[in-house]
Amino acid sequence: MTSERKMLVTSALPYANGHLHLGHLVEHIQTDIWVRTHKMLGIQCISVCGDDAHGTPIMLKAEQLGITPEALTAEIKLSHEKDFKAFAIDYDYYHTTHSPENQALATTIFERLQAGGDIVKKTIRQFYDPVKQMFLPDRYVKGTCPKCAAVDQYGDNCEVCGATYSPTDLINPVSVISGVSPVEKESEHYFFDLPRYEELLKDWTRKGHLQTEVTNKLSEWFEAGLKQWDISRDAPYFGFPIPGVPDKYFYVWLDAPIGYMASFKKYCDERGVSFDEFWDKASKTELYHFVGKDIVYFHALFWPAMLAASGFRTPTAVYTHGFLTVEGQKMSKSRGTFIEARAYLAHLHPEYLRYYFAAKLNGRVDDLDLNFDDFVNRVNADLVGKVVNIASRCAGFINKRFDNRLSSELNDQKLYNDLLSARESVIDAFVSRDYARAIRQIMDCADKVNQYIDANKPWVLAKDESKLNEVHAICTMGINLFRILITYLKPVLPMMAKASEEFLNSEPLHWDSIDKPLLNHRINTFKPLMVRVEKEKIEAMLVQSKESLMTTPVKENTPVEDANLISIEDFAKVDLRIAKIVNAEPVEGADKLMRLILDLGDAQKQVFAGIKKAYDAEELIGRLTVMVANLEPRTMRFGVSEGMVLAAGDGQGIYLLQPDAGALPGMKVK
């Protein structure tokens, strides 16, 4: 089966400041299934992705860790690639936006936009952190909501009342980075004149390049009016400098989608493929992007407009999916449902999740819910109970009674043809991204096979030596029907398909390889292809993921007059200092300990604190706290602890002390 079609497929680029979680995997599994489907059809289908490696969050996290942004993003990229490989997500090339290819393409596109009159310069006012000497993105300013007076709200929207506003509207604004009150400063920024392309975008968005619900949503944005898009950021910033403009950088969202092109460019350079054939304005190839609904605005408006304005082709389609919920709710660290890929892999087989997501994904923008009872039932009933059970039951007889050799003919050609007749419908469902429909059809076929085996009862016939030919024919039929089923499931379960190919002693399975059954063919000894999900492993995964509160014994209240009172002179001996947590990591082998690196302004100290069960390491980094700076160092088996952080506890939890806005590392607490 071959085709003249040529396709390039991408997934949204994971941000390079943290590990993958199950929410990421929805999209990447969805993309991988679609790509595998087309490759099995003989289509040249190239899939590329990479890490989104620029921006303020990466710059600040690297600073907190005491490493360069390049070192941080390189480490995270390795983690992402390792997780993708474990889940059998097989990109033809996986790159990074911090690459020579991306810088060259971003510069080319910017210069073309500038030459075409699409870049506008405007002076804007924004918050500036006088301590860090940097302009602050919206999410790095917090304060009191101007609408409902809720405290500790971000600079772009209130999580209590839902209001949106400018950071300068906040009451008592504070820099999240330094804790000081920011000041307003002017800066000249570069804008892409998106409204110039409103008619082009209206036409493009209504020509079948998007799902209907996405097109309808975009209509609302058109009615509200498109706005010029700020594509520049001020130094300090981790990204690409704007050519010829001192201290100005391309905004991460300008070069991030260009990263698709850069990853493909690297692929082309290494394999001798024509980049222009796929990206030229007159290209006859197909270009598909898979994205989440939270970034539709960038991919369905900015991206096609920017491509068209700079002389490149626009996407054939942008396919949008919904969010992942767990047990009907948003993923939550406190409930243990914010599950990283590596936590899942420590307890469960990756193809359980590939199958479950496939069974629930369709071509719409619906959210997908991971319900663990449903997860267990689907995997155990469908994969183990229906599909694998067919091979297991039939192979046992073939291996033991017939020297691993199948019989020379099928005994129910009609049933074989019946399963083959589902092929086009299954392929259509996968191509339409309605994987749930494909899975339903495949399981309907599996039911027919199990009914056939149950009706013929080879285990009963095997007791009669005169019936062994019938047993041989029935089990040969079962093995061949299993071969059809595993071919249909191959885009979803590539690891199980490969193991099945080894068991069947066959060439790699393709959509047309099942036209001829395996007859008078020697198979290999059957080995278990998949085992049942154990609920205990799910519970262990949730425990590992959970940000549970530490519980401590409740002490009886003691009257103040009975306490061991100290003098003011004794208290003065304790050197309490404001400290900034620049790094935090759990201590392996210790249930409670977290290793903290604390910045005191003129020095750094290492402290081991018993807060591991109360906080995630990531949420501690960058916070200010209070420490005892002159405590005698204590040698522990994990290292030397050079102080103590202060925390409050009520027997139900533990809470780090945090100073008020304006406090700086090294300040003395009096």
UniProtKB/Swiss-Prot annotation:
Q: Which domain of life is it from?
A: Bacteria
The protein's predominant localisation is cytoplasm
Report motif location: 'HIGH' region: 14-24
EC class: ligase
Q: Where in the cell is it found?
A: Cytoplasm
Q: Which InterPro entries match?
A: aa-tRNA-synth_I_CS (IPR001412), Anticodon_Met (IPR041872), Met-tRNA-synth_bsu_C (IPR004495), Met-tRNA_ligase_1 (IPR023458), Met-tRNA_synth (IPR014758), Methionyl/Leucyl_tRNA_Synth (IPR015413), MetRS_core (IPR033911), MetRS_Zn (IPR029038)
Q: Where is this motif: 'KMSKS' region?
A: 330-334
Needs which cofactor?
Zn(2+)
Q: Which residues form a coiled coil?
A: none
EC number(s): the record gives 6.1.1.10
Similarity-based family: Belongs to the class-I aminoacyl-tRNA synthetase family. MetG type 1 subfamily.
**Quaternary structure annotation from Swiss-Prot or TrEMBL:** Homodimer.
Protein name per UniProt: Methionine--tRNA ligase
Task: Name the species this protein comes from.
Answer: Legionella pneumophila subsp. pneumophila (strain Philadelphia 1 / ATCC 33152 / DSM 7513)
Q: Which gene encodes it?
A: metG
